[in-house]
């Protein structure tokens, strides 16, 4: 059965055991208090993307033993903790390591979290070329992924349907002022005619991945395409002007001229 702790103890839980000790002879010194503390901590980075689990053992306000999931074992902080460290590493180490998942991760996922942590923002994806396009010349494709939340995201490059792993680099996650993130993922490549490059983005806010394509083409083909688009735009403009002028010319009143103009 998975070990569970209340949600209020996710970041810090303190169990204080008061052990009262009195002298063995009657009428001796007044009773003395000895305080033993056990403090477990769960540290989260970007949700559950990275979790660190730390437990501290304290005797009379002095830490003597610690477990840190980044270290992976119990370590004595003072000489007092050395026997306990050896014993716990033999008897409880695997169970304590598992508590990173059974305690920290489990409670994070099961506990009601603030609205800001439940927020989902879908990324915007745009592909651009770092330099003017030229076939058979080294270049860099940039996949700009912006305005997404939470931070967990996976961006991959494909060429003609095959994933590219060589020549891929990425910036660190960049925080925006509205809590969203952005990242740039670059692909060093040499474009050749007919090749199709795809930026593939996976994110918790998406039901299915976003894929944006970029196709390599020659300058002449690009010029013809731009000329065709320009011709279509001009055609639409002139057609609109013609219809407007025709409509205006038909709006005037019809009928006989005014009587004063008759000879």
From Swiss-Prot:
List of glycosylated residues: 46
Gene3D superfamilies linked: Class II Histocompatibility Antigen, M Beta Chain, Chain B, domain 1 (3.10.320.10), Immunoglobulins (2.60.40.10)
TM stretches of this protein: 225-245
Region of interest called Beta-2, as start-end residue ranges on this chain: 121-214
Main location: membrane
Residue ranges the record marks as coiled coil: none
Protein name: H-2 class II histocompatibility antigen, A-U beta chain
Organism: Mus musculus (Mouse)
């Amino acid at each position: 059965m998975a070990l569970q702790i209340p949600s209020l103890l996710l970041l810090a839980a303190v169990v204080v055991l008061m052990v009262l000790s009195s002298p063995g002879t009657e009428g001796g010194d007044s009773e003395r208090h000895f305080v033993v503390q056990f403090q477990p901590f769960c540290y989260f980075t970007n949700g559950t993307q990275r979790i660190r689990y730390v437990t501290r053992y304290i005797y009379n306000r002095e830490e003597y033993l610690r477990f840190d999931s980044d270290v992976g074992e119990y370590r004595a902080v003072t000489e007092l903790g050395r026997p306990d460290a050896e014993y716990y590493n033999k008897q409880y180490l695997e169970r304590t390591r598992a508590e990173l998942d059974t305690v920290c991760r489990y409670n994070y996922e099961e506990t009601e979290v603030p609205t800001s942590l439940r927020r989902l923002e879908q990324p915007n994806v745009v592909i651009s070329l770092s330099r003017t396009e030229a076939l058979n010349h080294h270049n860099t494709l940039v996949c700009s992924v912006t305005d997404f939340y939470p931070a967990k995201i996976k961006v991959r490059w494909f060429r003609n349907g095959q994933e590219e792993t060589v020549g891929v680099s990425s910036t660190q996650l960049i925080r925006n002022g509205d809590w969203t993130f952005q990242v740039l993922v670059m692909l060093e490549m040499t474009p050749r005619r007919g090749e199709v490059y795809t930026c593939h983005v996976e994110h918790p806010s998406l039901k299915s991945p976003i894929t944006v394509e970029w196709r390599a083409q020659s300058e002449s083909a690009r010029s013809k395409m731009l000329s065709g688009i320009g011709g279509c735009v001009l055609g639409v403009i002139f057609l609109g002007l013609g219809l407007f002028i025709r409509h205006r010319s038909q709006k005037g009143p019809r009928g006989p001229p005014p009587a004063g103009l008759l000879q």
